[in-house]
Swiss-Prot record:
PANTHER family: UDP-N-ACETYLMURAMATE--L-ALANINE LIGASE (PTHR43445:SF3), UDP-N-ACETYLMURAMATE--L-ALANINE LIGASE-RELATED (PTHR43445). Pathway: Cell wall biogenesis; peptidoglycan biosynthesis. It comes from the Bacteria. GO terms for cellular component: cytoplasm. Its EC number is 6.3.2.8. It comes from Helicobacter pylori (strain HPAG1). It holds the Pfam family Mur_ligase_C. Keywords: ATP-binding, Cell cycle, Cell division, Cell shape, Cell wall biogenesis/degradation, Cytoplasm, Ligase, Nucleotide-binding, Peptidoglycan synthesis. Belongs to the MurCDEF family. This is UDP-N-acetylmuramate--L-alanine ligase.
């Protein structure tokens, strides 16, 4: 199924690598990791982002926007999946006969000699990767989100072992060289990449699992339930005595796992206990049980995943959930958190759908996912993520929520302003607000745009 890339990164020391789309979370992670390995990094993107600012602070030269003049005899060009053949920098690299790699192809070179704990699934992979990196602090880590433990999406280590968040959206997880394949779920998404062929989609997961020496799976998933090869298996019944507490004002889940005793992990919800359990089971051959138990406490959450931005008169949470399953699970966590805080405030949801294709593919589930634990729904325009706009009558589809439609939300001090046509139509000064989406809602809620 895999074709080995014709261009391989060999000696990284002083290798000149240019990243097109360097601001993306996946590409920026590779750029940080390779810079730490001794490579000379440059890059470009269409706009300034936190990742771009971070890399510039490290001394990386970055062009905004893309500029063919930035291509000047680098050893290799690596580009994100969203970059097309007609990109000016791609065209210039071809003129200069500089090797060009997609992120997917570059992964093969970067990971082929590593002992990779590769985490992949529709939901929970960032959290599991960050939890496992907390449990195994001597491992390197490349995560698709910022771990609050070390305030980055990358942790460099001389150790051959690496915790890696793999990506099924472009099938690049197949290039991650898994020593251990860790899969919490396989709910179909990104089917456009697989030609809307479910058989092809599930075959990719099977290939990923089959080519790992070690497999850790959650058998409540319909596909994983039928997986027949040797694996470390987690089932719902293996996790019990789940309780939720506030510790020093922070939310934690305590639970017992199989016959391994009790564990405590930052965050709330059954899904949080499941994610932590998969990380624990993945590490059993790496450390003793007490080290695992203690190191898990170093996990402090990840940016944009139940990210508590403030907790005063207005409790404000930012969450990356952009699929109905994720939204439903996180809303349950929000209700648990509200109960722990003993607040009587309504839970207000601000939702920014991410991609027209995802919204249309999951429309019926989106229409149901706010039914529990959402007292008021506020809807932002769809974040297209470069997709062509489609006409979707959200007012009709979501009328059963009596939603409020706005153009954007603006953080002003400790308050939130709701805007339509650049006019403030409402100010939220107190209450419990959670924002959902993988687009720019995170910057709106943080007052960064």
């Amino acid at each position: 199924m895999l074709e080995t890339p014709k261009v391989l990164l060999k000696n990284l020391q002083d290798c000149k690598i240019h990243f097109i789309g360097i601001g993306g979370i996946g590409i920026s992670g590779l750029a940080k990791y390779l810079k730490a390995q001794g490579a000379k990094i440059s890059g470009s993107d269409i706009a300034i982002s936190p990742s771009v600012k971070y890399l510039k602070a490290l001394g990386v030269e970055i062009n905004i926007p893309h500029d063919p003049k930035a291509i000047n005899h680098q050893d290799v060009i690596i580009h994100s999946a969203i970059i097309k053949e007609d990109n000016k920098e791609i065209q210039r690299a071809k003129e200069l006969k500089i090797p060009i790699l997609s992120r997917k192809d570059a992964l093969y070179s970067i990971l082929k000699d590593k002992r990779v704990f590769s985490v992949c699934g529709a939901h929970g992979k960032s959290s599991i990767t960050a939890m496992l990196s907390a449990i195994c602090p001597f491992f390197g880590a490349i995560i698709g989100a910022h771990s609050k433990e070390f305030d980055s999406n990358v942790r460099e280590s001389a150790n051959d072992s690496l915790v890696f968040e793999a990506d099924e959206s472009d099938s690049s997880f197949l290039f991650s060289n898994p020593y251990a394949a860790i899969v919490p779920n396989t709910e179909p998404e990104h089917l456009e990449h697989y030609g809307h062929d479910l058989e092809r989609f599930f075959f990719a997961y099977e290939y990923f699992l089959d080519h790992a020496q070690k497999r850790v799976i959650y058998k409540e998933d319909p596909f994983l339930k039928s997986y027949s090869k040797d694996a470390i298996v987690l089932e719902k019944k293996d996790i019990y005595n789940i309780q939720y507490i506030l510790k020093d004002g922070e939310p934690y889940t305590s639970f017992e796992l199989k016959d391994l005793g009790a564990f405590l992990v930052w965050g709330l919800g059954e899904h949080n206990a499941t994610n932590a359990s998969l990380a624990i089971l993945s590490a059993l051959d790496e450390l003793n049980l007490e080290e695992i138990r203690n190191n898990l406490l170093n996990f402090k959450g990840i940016k944009k995943r139940f990210d508590i931005l403030q907790k005063n008169a207005l409790i404000l949470i930012d969450d990356y959930a952009h699929h109905p399953t994720e939204i439903s699970a996180t809303l349950k966590s929000a209700r648990i958190y509200a109960n722990l805080l003993d607040t009587q405030e309504q839970i207000i949801v601000i939702w920014q759908a991410h991609k027209y294709s995802r919204l249309m593919d999951n429309l019926e589930e989106f229409k149901k996912c706010f039914l529990e634990h959402c007292d008021r729904l506020i809807i932002l325009p769809v974040y297209s993520a470069s997709e062509v706009k489609r006409d979707i009558d959200l007012k009709t589809h979501f009328k059963h929520y009596n939603p409020t439609f706005i153009d954007r939300v603006r953080k002003k001090g400790d308050f939130l302003e709701l805007l339509v046509n650049d006019n403030v139509v409402e100010t939220i000064e107190k209450g419990f607000v959670i924002g959902f989406g993988a687009g720019d809602i995170t910057y709106q809620l943080r007052g960064e745009m």
